[in-house]
Amino acid sequence: MALSKIDTAGLAADAVDNTILDLTSNYAFTGTITGAGGYTQGTKVSPTSGTTVDFTGIPNNVKVIHILFDLVERTSSAWGIIQLGDSGGFETTGYTSSVGYPGTGNTYTANAAADTNGLKFWYYGATKHSGIATIMRFSTDQTQWIMSSRCHAADSQSYSCYSAVERTLSADLTQIRITMASGAYSSTGGDINILYTS
């Protein structure tokens, strides 16, 4: 049978002032809460032209970063790419990567020369895409990062894309770039934003 009340006589005295805990009271707490602090959300960007979107000023204690895409479109078909950057600029080569997507004959590409310039997250142009890329710190400092992404076509084309990448930087990660091999962001817009946590 379910209990409908708590027998306060069975509660142990607390460790503060040796009084019995009163469940009807409103307690005030003081001090500083430490540990995981939740996510910080960036400022949403809605690109309608140009080739790059940059998120800068990433704090030096970040461990996990999410990049969110909603109905983003480009003018032509070519790889959309995510690149990491530190105080010396953006890293445009040296990524160990693989990407799988159902292109012609269910194409699968793994660590080809053309795939060392960043995380590939979608291919087709003139098609709206939505997805998420996750960037996680692998090392105790802020230099070694693992990235993965999942993206799908939101209209027209019917396909999805999955990627994984590793990159070690020469200094702490401070910025992220979303760019493309060719073409530009479409005038139809769409939204890109970033979330990160320590």
Language-model features and meaning:
Residues 1-44, 48:
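Fibrous stalk/shaft segments of extracellular and virion attachment machinery
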Residues 35-198:
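Surface-exposed molecular-recognition determinants
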